[in-house]
């Protein structure tokens, strides 16, 4: 992306110190971009990136950060399903109002934007509701204000460096892959909410990062691209994921655990089917290059085995 008369390429990544964010930053750096990371507190970004302290809820700091960028990938947000149901306001303020601040700044400076959204946008939990709201605002900005904005609906991203929840890590949000792997590696049974028939689409985090950057480049070249779905299209039940993890942990460590079922958590659907359509990735030319689930689980088990040592 050519900068505004400066001859450099600079991308701002909000939430660039998060799980997907760090991979997106590394992908950008690998392609030769100058990268700034917008974060609320000091955390060392990926090597080669510049940290910009700021909160997306603060329109002034967002506008200032965007004014120095040639492109924006917006990932910052408050996560959680059952964790945010009893107190949705913080997530709504950050995800919706903060997201609007990012959209307004990008529209003001005519900067191409890629906004991350969720595959389960129809679910009645705070995260899905707030992320879908911003996705709708993107559509409004594109249609009525001529903004160069594209949505990437990320399905269930997983991989090394994903933060585990207690007792294995500091995350307040329990994610399926680190939870399953950490429990299995420590000899604890894998816990599944519901009967495990829920269908998910697991996508390796490096593939998500590649899609985000490719979407930004295409938006810069050709304008708004509508919606890309960052998913493999592979229908995998939660039970399938658990048994793949059990098998891989047994292969790498010799430890064998069982799978147990618990009641469903609030905010989740026992019969959910959340699948991406990789055909949407055709314009990016990467739909058939996604890492198979078995290979991604093997890489993830290797990482968490070292993490837990």
Q: Residues of each region from the PLM?
A:
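Generic anion/oxyanion-binding catalytic loop in active/binding sites
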Residues: 51, 73, 80, 88, ...
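C-terminal substrate-binding subdomain of Rossmann-fold SDR/epimerase-dehydratase oxidoreductases
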Residues: 185-189, 193-309
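Structural element of the ATP-grasp superfamily
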Residues: 102, 138, 180, 280-282
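N-terminal Rossmann-like NAD(P)+-binding domain of SDR-like oxidoreductases, especially those catalyzing
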Residues: 1-160, 299, 303
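Short secondary-structure boundary/capping segments
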Residues: 3, 42-43, 181-182, 219-220
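Residues in well-ordered alpha-helical elements
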Residues: 60-63, 82, 89, 100, ...
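Conserved alpha-helical elements of sugar-nucleotide-dependent glycosyltransferases
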Residues: 20-23, 98, 172, 176, ...
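NAD(P)-dependent short-chain dehydrogenase/reductase
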Residues: 126, 132, 136-200, 205-214, ...
């Amino acid at each position: 992306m050519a900068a505004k008369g400066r001859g450099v390429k600079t991308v701002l990544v909000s939430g660039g110190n998060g799980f997907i964010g760090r991979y997106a930053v590394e992908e950008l750096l690998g392609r030769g971009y100058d990268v700034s990371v917008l974060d609320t507190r000091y955390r060392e970004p990926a090597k080669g990136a510049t940290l910009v302290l700021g909160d997306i809820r603060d329109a002034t700091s967002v506008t200032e950060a965007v004014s120095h960028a040639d492109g924006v990938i917006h990932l910052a947000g408050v996560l959680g399903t059952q964790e945010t149901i009893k107190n949705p306001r913080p997530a709504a303020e950050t995800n919706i109002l903060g997201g609007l601040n990012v959209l307004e700044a990008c529209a003001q400076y005519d900067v191409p934007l890629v906004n991350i959204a969720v595959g389960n946008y129809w679910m009645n939990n705070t995260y899905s509701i707030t992320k879908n709201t911003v996705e709708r605002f993107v559509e409004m900005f594109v249609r009525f204000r001529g903004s160069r904005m594209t949505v990437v609906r990320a399905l269930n991203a997983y991989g090394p460096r994903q933060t585990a929840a207690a007792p294995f890590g500091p995350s307040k949000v329990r994610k399926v892959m680190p939870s399953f792997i950490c429990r299995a590696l420590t000899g604890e049974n894998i816990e599944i909410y519901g009967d495990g028939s829920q269908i998910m689409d697991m996508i390796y985090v490096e593939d998500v990062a590649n899609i985000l950057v490719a979407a930004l480049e295409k938006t810069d070249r050709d304008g708004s691209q509508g919606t890309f779905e960052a998913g493999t299209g592979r229908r995998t039940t939660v039970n399938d994921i658990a048994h793949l993890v059990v098998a891989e942990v047994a292969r790498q460590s010799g430890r064998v655990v069982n799978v147990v079922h618990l009641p469903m958590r609030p905010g989740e659907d026992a019969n959910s089917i959340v699948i991406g359509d990789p055909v949407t990735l055709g314009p990016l030319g990467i739909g058939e290059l996604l890492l198979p689930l078995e290979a991604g689980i093997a890489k993830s088990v290797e990482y968490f085995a070292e993490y837990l040592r």
